[in-house]
UniProtKB/Swiss-Prot annotation:
Signal peptide per UniProt: none
Function: Transcription factor which regulates nonfermentable carbon utilization. Activator of gluconeogenetic genes.
Species of provenance: Coccidioides posadasii (strain C735)
Official protein name in the record: Transcription activator of gluconeogenesis CPC735_053490
UniProt keyword Transcription regulation present: yes
Sequence ranges of Low complexity compositional bias: 160-171, 213-229
Keyword annotations: Activator, DNA-binding, Gluconeogenesis, Metal-binding, Nucleus, Transcription, Transcription regulation, Zinc
DNA-binding region: 77-105
Length: 713
């Protein structure tokens, strides 16, 4: 294509000289269209002007310093990009219009950097993709016909044409409608539940709902047909998921070196604060549709009803559905979804398309529950009388709003500050004293054969303990105890939140933390396990009789009071006191293999936990010496877990069989805490499967043992 074909016929220029062709190489084709054509190139490029005349500087001259500067486009179109010419921000650009290819004018594709190879193309510069869509949307909007009594009328879906769709949500029309279109195919309380999962961004802009402002009730059914034509024109124009403005992202405030990283970070934050809080009703909340189970999650600022299943959508600004809606809405069930329909729920939730989460995630009130909607008092009893409602009474019911989420009562919980750990720990923990107490307990309780097996297991890891601790000074030992207390501080929250019976003990076997479920299962109180109350247990799981307290080495004397170590601290209960003989031996043999072995390893096996039984419990169950006063004393010293469920003391001569018949089991096998207490009621042992692992400190020394138990039912 020649220059004459592009710019028209060449006009004769009397001042044109051969010197006029000495122009810079970067003169654009747009500049060539505004300046006079010069003589053919290659003729006397170095000749001087004749008769001393000089060519006047025009505004289009590339060397003119006063010429208007052309603003560089943020992204050139494909044609200008291939031609290496200056393009404009408008689409189609002026160069493509002159060439007659305005229909093919679209943004060019830039070469991505290496660190953006995995990024989708639409996510690199999303805020520049609205120009093409806006032009197409404006064209489609002006060509949508709406038939009303045989006449065509244009509906103003939006108050004004926007140069960019980012400002759409700032100019939303008023949600109240004079006369909306309602269908008799369904009632508002039986809306189909929309699936939040959406592989594509299929937000439906319903002009049949939003374009009915100011129209009478006799609006023809052709609105629904026009809505189907308008969906293609507005679906991608005003709801582009790659635009950060739709999600209220302020990318400039994010301290990221690249645009894609900031967009990804903002998207994750949006998912955590929006879709993560109320996944079942999040998609319905933002656009005024009704979620599953009739939950009244809706907003007043939305004019777009969604009907994924093809059924008509309803707008909640409608004054005619207030009476039926208020009687059927269940405000207490907004977040309690129907568990019977869980199989129909999707496995993921789509990200919302509108910037609804303007509030900070740290705010007390959920941002999804801030909008309210008022309904009218005097409404039509049936939908057949909707056409006669032309005026809305001024009397209104109280404002109906969705209830707030029940937050945890943090004020009632004790304030925990990990800084107090570093201030309170002043002395190292005496593990030597703990091992001496453990050795004395093992020799006092176990038989020589079992004692020898435990001693061999501990002797195999003794050199490793000596090698790892010989270079540690006092400051290191204090720091080791601070690490232990800090780790235990983290485990306490986990134990309280987890429903599995859990205990945490030191490497000496001393109990350091215990969960409520473990106390319910075994009857051991937390204060007794931690050494804060006397340990009156006499149940050692001996073989000479059920709960006789007699082992192969003879009777085991319980602690009559709280044992005080030479260091001044109380003596917690050892792990060996909670297990029967065989389970203790197997534990220490496994501990010898795992203590300095696999740091991430764990052991899963079976054991038998010993129930907490005092002498008063033994006498009551055996039927020898029992009285009401003794039972009251037992209730103060122990847990009272073996009392009958009726709360009355057992009479003399009452057998174990009669107590066993008082157990009440549910269909699941256990009736609450009472059923958990009945486990191991007969022989004082609870057969469990348990898993435990060893956590090490910064010096690679076994620091604590975490154990989880599950009873075998």
């Amino acid at each position: 294509m020649t220059a004459n074909a592009i710019n028209g016929p060449v006009l004769p220029t009397p001042l044109a000289t051969p010197g006029d062709n000495n122009k810079s190489a970067d003169t654009t084709m747009a500049d060539q269209g505004t300046r006079p054509e010069s003589q053919p190139q290659g003729q006397n490029n170095g000749a001087k002007p004749q008769n001393g005349q000089t060519k006047p500087m025009s505004a289009a001259n590339a060397k003119d310093p006063l010429r208007p500067r052309r603003k560089k486009a943020k992204r050139a179109c494909f044609a200008c990009q291939r031609a290496h010419l200056t393009c404009g921000d408008e689409r189609p650009c002026q160069r493509c219009i002159k060439r007659g290819i305005q229909n093919a004018c679209h943004d060019g594709v830039r070469k991505k950097a290496k660190y953006l190879h995995d990024a989708p193309n639409e996510a690199l510069m999303p805020h520049l993709q609205g120009h093409l869509y806006t032009t197409q949307a404006n064209t489609a909007r002006n060509t949508i016909p709406l038939t009303r009594n045989g006449s065509n009328s244009k509906t103003n879906f939006y108050p004004q044409q926007q140069s960019s769709f980012n400002n759409f949500y700032q100019n939303k029309p008023d949600p109240t409608l004079n006369q909306p279109q309602l269908h008799d195919t369904g009632r508002p309380d039986t809306f189909p539940s929309q699936s939040p999962v959406s592989p594509t961004f299929n937000m439906t802009a319903n002009p049949a709902a939003s374009g009915n402002q100011g129209l009478p009730s006799s609006l023809s059914a052709s609105n629904s047909n026009a809505s189907g034509q308008a969906q293609n024109g507005f679906g991608s124009a005003f709801f582009d998921p790659s635009d950060p403005a739709l999600f209220n992202f302020d990318l400039a405030s994010m301290n990221f070196g690249n645009h894609y990283g900031a967009l990804e970070f903002g998207m994750l934050g949006h998912m955590a604060t929006g879709a993560g809080e109320t996944p079942p009703s999040d998609g319905a909340t933002q656009h005024g549709s009704v979620g599953r189970s009739g939950s009244g999650t809706y907003t007043a600022g939305s004019n777009f009803g969604e009907s994924p299943t093809g059924q008509p959508s309803f707008l909640f600004g409608d004054p005619t559905i207030g009476g039926d809606w208020t009687s059927s809405v269940n405000t207490r069930n907004i977040y309690g979804q129907n568990m019977n329909n869980m199989s129909e729920t999707p496995h993921a939730f789509a990200i919302e398309s509108a910037p609804a989460n303007f509030a900070s995630p740290n705010s007390i009130e959920s941002p999804l529950l801030t909008n309210t909607t008022t309904f009218d008092d005097n409404t039509a009893p049936t939908y057949a009388n909707r056409a006669n409602i032309n005026s809305v009474p001024s009397q209104r019911q109280p404002v109906v709003s969705t209830p707030q989420l029940k937050h945890l009562q943090v004020g009632k919980r004790r304030q925990r500050n990990p800084s107090a750990i570093y201030d309170s720990v002043k002395e190292p923990y005496s593990y030597t004293t703990g091992f001496h107490s453990l050795t004395a307990f093992i020799q006092r309780r176990f038989s020589p054969q079992n004692t020898l097996r435990i001693a061999k297991a501990l002797a195999s890891i003794r050199p490793s303990f000596i090698a790892t601790t010989k270079t540690l000074n006092r400051d290191d030992l204090i720091f080791m105890e601070k690490c232990f207390q800090r780790t235990l501080w983290e485990y306490e929250d986990f134990i309280n939140a987890c429903g599995t019976p859990t205990i945490v003990c030191r490497r000496t076997g001393e109990i350091a933390a215990v969960g409520k479920e473990f106390s319910i299962l075994t009857g051991w109180k937390k204060e007794v396990l931690l050494g804060k109350e006397p340990n009156l247990n006499i149940n050692t799981g001996g073989s000479s009789g059920a709960m006789s307290g007699v082992t192969s080495r003879g009777s085991f004397t319980p602690r009559t009071g709280m044992d005080i170590n030479p260091t001044g601290r109380t003596q917690p209960v050892f792990l060996a006191e909670l297990l029967d003989d065989e389970s203790v031996v197997e534990f220490y043999e496994d501990f010898a293999k795992l203590a300095f072995g696999d740091s991430r390893g764990s052991v899963m096996t079976t054991c038998k936990l010993l129930k907490y039984k005092t002498k008063a419990d033994m006498d009551m169950l055996s039927g020898t010496t029992s009285s009401a006063g003794g039972e009251n004393e037992h209730g103060a010293a122990g847990n009272g877990d073996v009392k009958p469920e009726n709360g009355m003391g057992a009479s003399n001569g009452q057998s174990q069989h009669s107590l066993q018949r008082q157990r009440k089991w549910s269909r699941g096998g256990i009736a609450g805490e009472a059923g958990m207490n009945q486990l191991g009621f007969k022989d004082g042992k609870v057969e469990c499967s348990y898993c435990w692992t060893v956590k090490r400190d910064v010096f690679d020394i076994p620091m604590l043992i975490v154990m989880n138990f599950l009873p075998c039912i």
